[in-house]
């Protein structure tokens, strides 16, 4: 959520941000917000003046009654009228405050100056050079779905029977490989990258979704348990960030770094017509998430650190990838700056998103009321929050299966995963 003071002082800058994000349709909301803010401040001033008058007259009434020097009836009648006027103003202020909060929750985050201006994903910039690893595939490459079925390690048909399309089942060594991938990433982040592991709930309340920005803008993308008013998490970012909702953090404790595994659930409403084969688009997948809480002046260095930690996982797995700096028209509404990390699919002949690393600045912290005090004399400040996928296993599994396939129709296991799997290859006879 943006600071209303920032919006009031920089309305043209906010309007430019909406234009750069291709959200010109939100400009009437901005104009309405500015109108409400002006009216609200006028009403607050008038209410304060009337309350001050009521306090003064109340003292005069008390003095008249005490001294008996005159009648207080007219003053009492006047103050009753003032009280009714104050009640009306308070009611109007309450309505304005609710509408203001509704608009503030709907407006996107500011953009860091380093974010390139663009309309669509086609305008994203390749950051640095793509990273390659030697995986000679001198034969006709099979896709992950074909190989997974042939080896008996993936079962999308039974997943569809049990739940519906987009809910995969990992079988045998496929399940073992998935678990190995999760454990390897958690170990690398906690033992080498300095994160504290947490294992969060997979269901959250609406306040948690509001805190991280999924509510109300992306309400149609989450699974909702209406009877209990709980929601299946789209990412561990939601419960982990909200661990510190409504808290005053110790400045000495910052930065705080968490790594969390969770299953992730996404309705993917509006994805009809997109490629939905295999792991390319699923409703449930596994992911290890990195979340950081930092001082404002340290957040952009922390973003580069998170990106580096995600890249380190791919380098250890020897999976080819590239990094994109997202443009203004493709970046999420909550992020001020975002990198996407994409892995190469030999069968699809294209890059697939496996990680997003974002700096939200104080956008989430304002919504979730997460603050810190630099010292005992300072005013509380909002922390900056960041997160990064470290990483999503579904797209990693695509790349591993396709890059490590053998001429015989099997799959070699990446060397760093062998201690976790207990086997180095998945053969057609498994």
Curated annotation (Swiss-Prot):
Keywords: Aminoacyl-tRNA synthetase, ATP-binding, Cytoplasm, Ligase, Nucleotide-binding, Protein biosynthesis. Its main location: cytoplasm. It is found in: Cytoplasm. ATP binds at residues 266-268, 282, 353-356. CDD domains: SerRS_core. It catalyses: tRNA(Ser) + L-serine + ATP = L-seryl-tRNA(Ser) + AMP + diphosphate + H(+); tRNA(Sec) + L-serine + ATP = L-seryl-tRNA(Sec) + AMP + diphosphate + H(+). One of its GO terms (cellular component) is cytoplasm. GO terms for molecular function: ATP binding; serine-tRNA ligase activity. Disulfide bonds: none annotated. InterPro entries: aa-tRNA-synt_IIb (IPR002314), aa-tRNA-synth_II (IPR006195), aa-tRNA-synth_II/BPL/LPL (IPR045864), Ser-tRNA-ligase_type_1 (IPR002317), Ser-tRNA-synth_1_N (IPR015866), SerRS_1_N_sf (IPR042103), SerRS_core (IPR033729), tRNA-bd_arm (IPR010978). Pathway: Aminoacyl-tRNA biosynthesis; selenocysteinyl-tRNA(Sec) biosynthesis; L-seryl-tRNA(Sec) from L-serine and tRNA(Sec): step 1/1. L-serine binds at residues 235-237, 289, 389. PROSITE patterns: AA_TRNA_LIGASE_II (PS50862). One of its GO terms (biological process) is selenocysteine biosynthetic process. It comes from the Bacteria. Consists of two distinct domains, a catalytic core and a N-terminal extension that is involved in tRNA binding. Homodimer. The tRNA molecule binds across the dimer. Belongs to the class-II aminoacyl-tRNA synthetase family. Type-1 seryl-tRNA synthetase subfamily. Catalyzes the attachment of serine to tRNA(Ser). Is also able to aminoacylate tRNA(Sec) with serine, to form the misacylated tRNA L-seryl-tRNA(Sec), which will be further converted into selenocysteinyl-tRNA(Sec). This is Serine--tRNA ligase. The lineage of its organism: Bacteria, Pseudomonadati, Chlorobiota, Chlorobiia, Chlorobiales.
